[in-house]
Amino acid sequence: MRPHIHIPDSLMRQFIGIATLVASSAMGAQQPVAASKAPTLIRNATVLTVTKGRLENTDLLLQNGKIAQIGKNLAAPAGAQVIDATGKYVMPGIIDPHSHTMIDAVNEGSLSVTSMVRVRDVLDPTDVNIYRQLAGGVTTINVLHGSANTIGGQNAVVKLKWGRDADEMLFPNATPGIKFALGENVTRKNSQQAQQASGQPLRYPATRMGQEEVLRDAFTRARDYKAQWDDYNARVKKGEKNLVAPERNLELEPLVEVLEGKRFVHAHSYRGDEMLMLLEIAKEFGFTVKTLQHGLEGYKIASEIAQAGTGLSSFADEWSYKIEAYDAIPYNVPILLHHGVVATVNSDSDERARRLNIDAAKMIRYGGLSEDEALKTITYNGAVQLGVQDRVGSIEVGKDADVVIWSGDPLSVYSSAETTFIDGEVFFDKQRDLAMRDQMTKERAALEAADRGRRPVVP
């Protein structure tokens, strides 16, 4: 039997106070701004449209979730919230083409091909990194499966609507995608060291040769599966009776969608030779790789990538953290853009995602990009890579009202995101955040003061 422990009243009050403070801090800092249907008029800002240049002293009207008007001296609709943005900048919401935010176990690495698993099934809408990335001006992310196997799971394109259910965050009608992976991450998963550490048996493939075979085998099976369904559907259309449909295969269905151009391939890769191999496989089976992810040696084969109609999403200045990253250079993205490749900068990190604006600025330093070209690497080009450029990525009338007000030029280290809108609703407001922090500090001080000096109760 456990002994009875008496806790003095003063100590109990202190425990309760601390627990209350922790709970209120966690919930208060994370509560989204209440949804508002009222229009918002942003006045007198420097508007970085990305696709149509810089507009000085310009107004922006957000209404019904869209960018309704752009111009000078716009009239405020009845009931509109008016924000004076004099001296401030407005740009499109940042798009991160490679993220693992909202998911914990990113790899279903038990098989070489796991095209049947879906990231959308495990999205965590309470991940605090959503809020932190909103504070960095990010509005849309491409949540990808990990890179442990040659053909991984299906991705999810997400709008960071903090405080909403996961289903409400899914980008409506975004083209679905799937994650592929080449190189060291796949082979390391199957190394002797990994086997000893996990106690699991080795899984094929263990070499780049094996990765190529896995791809060719998977698409051969997918092509045959597609042919079976095409034949069945054709016979049904002719009116034939007593037909038996092919058995449904959840592994091959997404790969058939790739063959039909209905699903994008986002392929983790580093070395030029392995990227060329994948482009050859795609050519053999008649599909296009939408993006090469990371692609640190992309500059070596920029012409071939452009000819294939493939995009590339890279880091601004990450290299030499593993052997296949040794030949990376900071000029990778500018060189690719020069060759006509739709290139972007991604984070692959909850932390770096909050500073993608600074990564874009590095493209000006390393490669001499213009302001618009640099901003496109974190906005419009990412929208193209995800197939949502008609909705987001630039400030144009009719597009989704995913915009960010910055304290200054977003390409400056001295600037910060002040207000982040998604579909015209505020999901991050810096002044509200600071006021909440101040309130919590005062609450803590009051709780400590209430207990300070009290004499403990002796049992």
Describe the role of every protein-language-model region.
Residues 10, 30-31, 37, 419-459:
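Extracellular/periplasmic ectodomains of large secreted or surface enzymes and adhesion receptors
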Residues 13-26:
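Bacterial N-terminal signal peptides
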Residues 31-36, 47, 51-91:
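Histidine-rich, glycine-flanked metal-binding segment
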Residues 45, 396-440:
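C-terminal cap of metal-dependent C-N hydrolases
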Residues 85-156, 164:
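Metal-associated gating/positioning segment near the N- to mid-region
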Residues 105-108, 113-117, 264, 303-306, ...:
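His/Asp/Glu-enriched, well-ordered alpha-helical/loop segment
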Residues 107-123, 164, 177-181, 186-197, ...:
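Active-site gating loops and adjacent loop-to-helix segments of metal-dependent hydrolytic enzymes
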Residues 134-293, 416, 422, 450-458:
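Polyanionic/metal-chelating signatures
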